[in-house]
Amino acid sequence: MKILVLTVNTRPSNNLEVWKNSASRNGYEYKILGMGEKWKGWAWRTQKYIDELQLQKNIDIFILCDSDDLYFTGSKSEFLEKFLNYKTNIMIGMEENCCTGDESQEYKNEVIRKLKKIAKEKNINTKYYFPNGGCVIGYRTPLIELLKENITAKDDQFGYTLLYKNDINKITPDYYQDIIGTCVQSIKFLEINKEWERYEDRVYNSLTNTYPVIMHFAGRNFNNYKRFLHSEDRKISFSPKIEIISYGRHLHDNLFLIVIILIIIFILILF
């Protein structure tokens, strides 16, 4: 089966070189969309994916993913074997503590309760409840249909969340980090809890007992991204500034906290 990795990235960076190296090393073919263009938001990225998928009629499976905070750890053959075992049209990465979007916290809490209820009803023992838009995998036609449904979402990640909440058969969550590992924890947390560990050049999740073939360090988790890099990629300088500009999805979730901190600092200066 033919597999193609698609990413949208508007500028060269060392992080992108890590992504490219990891894809090539593990046997994946890839295409970068949007290079040299101005970043215009998540809906724009969704449309980029739709346009490319409509052109790529000879590819069986697509991996749509970030490329500034993500890299491949397992081979294409391992990926294919795992994905086919799920017998699903679409799979999405999952994380434990991020419900994005500009909706009210009350509404988000309702969504969170629903996501946890879905997992419980499926007898899924996990803490990874929340879809992460940084890696979506699937077959061409179902992906196009999903992306078209999600095109109006200002935040594509929250859009995927609502689509899954309203129809649990539409997307298969990678609850156990089997294919897509999403690491958002701090280094201090990992040192204490050992949730994610590095064995040679693979990353292991001790909670799910899995070795993902794709690792995504979401939420500007640059320190762990660098910490878990493949030995060959450690030779490439790490440049976190790119993600803050282009992929600051989690940034708006922390704006309130940032404002409070600034107010406290201002008061301390005055007194």
Give residue spans per PLM region.
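N-terminal anchoring/stem segment of glycosyltransferases
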Residues: 1-61, 85, 251-268
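Generic preference for well-ordered alpha-helical elements
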Residues: 16, 43-46, 69, 73-76, ...
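Short, aromatic/basic amphipathic alpha-helical patches
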Residues: 16-25, 104-113, 227-233
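Short beta-strand-to-loop acidic/aromatic patch adjacent to the donor-nucleotide binding site
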Residues: 60-68
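Conserved donor-nucleotide/metal-binding helix-loop-beta segment in metal-dependent transferases, i.e.
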Residues: 70-121
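Pan-eukaryotic secretory-pathway lumenal catalytic ectodomains of glycan-active enzymes
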Residues: 195-266
